[in-house]
Regions:
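Structured partner-binding subdomains within large eukaryotic complex subunits
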Residues: 101-195
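Eukaryote-biased feature marking scaffold/signaling PDZ-domain proteins and nuclear chromatin regulators
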Residues: 11, 56-58, 72, 79, ...
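Acidic, metal/cofactor-coordinating or nucleic-acid-engaging core segments within structured domains
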Residues: 68-105
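Eukaryotic short linear interaction motifs
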Residues: 23-27, 67-75, 121-123, 131-133
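Short coil/turn segments at secondary-structure boundaries
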Residues: 29-32, 76-80, 126-129
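Charge-rich, low-complexity intrinsically disordered linkers/tails
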Residues: 1-57, 66, 151-195
């Protein structure tokens, strides 16, 4: 997430992440976002961009193994996912704050994460609690399980969940983001004239 305004010193680098391509937005929407993105090619930072090709990420996955990380492998993956998805949730909150609609995203799940190792999976939903100008970020555990139990009975559970995020949740989330972008004023100019 090398174009995202950092939360702390280290920028997240999830094993896998999903967001929206630049081309997912109309030319008019990209123009409205442009003042808040800057020149992404030269490395300007933005709340709305994770990388130069991904806007508004909504899913990350981290894979860790006990061999490399010890018994705390999943905890490490959870922390990395929490960092990545805090930036993702913050992006949506800041967009909605710009158009005075932040109440619509208060306490709503705005991103998901999957942490796993060679036998266990943890799935979380990430959301913000907005109290005036203060925003706090949280995660809600959706499911934790061992996919090797019961002769692999749960081996497709994460796939089915992720497919549901793509097919059901994501289109609604995208429409919500687009509706906020459409309310941004056109042709904002942040240039400061010389004295």
């Amino acid at each position: 997430m090398n174009n995202s305004i950092p939360l702390v010193g280290t920028r997240p680098q999830p094993d896998y992440s999903v967001g929206f391509k630049r081309e997912a937005f109309t030319e008019e929407q990209r123009e409205k976002l442009a003042p808040f993105i800057g020149d992404f090619i030269t490395g300007d930072w933005s709340y709305f961009m994770a990388t130069h090709y991904m806007y508004f990420p909504f899913l990350t996955c981290e894979v860790k193994c006990e061999v490399m990380c010890g018994a705390a492998a999943l905890d490490i993956a959870d922390r990395k996912n929490a960092h990545s998805m805090t930036l993702a949730v913050r992006a949506v909150v800041e967009l909605f704050r710009l158009v005075k609609r932040e109440k619509e995203v208060n306490r709503e799940i705005l991103a998901f994460s999957v942490s796993h190792d060679h036998r266990s999976v943890r799935i979380y939903g990430h959301y913000a609690v907005i109290d005036g100008s203060k925003t706090s970020f949280y995660r809600h555990p959706i499911r934790a399980f061992e996919f090797t139990d019961l002769d692999g009975k749960e081996k497709w559970t994460t796939y089915k969940f992720t497919k549901s995020v793509y097919d059901t949740w994501m289109p609604t989330h995208f429409k919500r983001i687009c509706s906020a972008i459409n309310e941004l004023p056109s042709k904002i100019n942040f240039d400061v004239s010389p004295l």
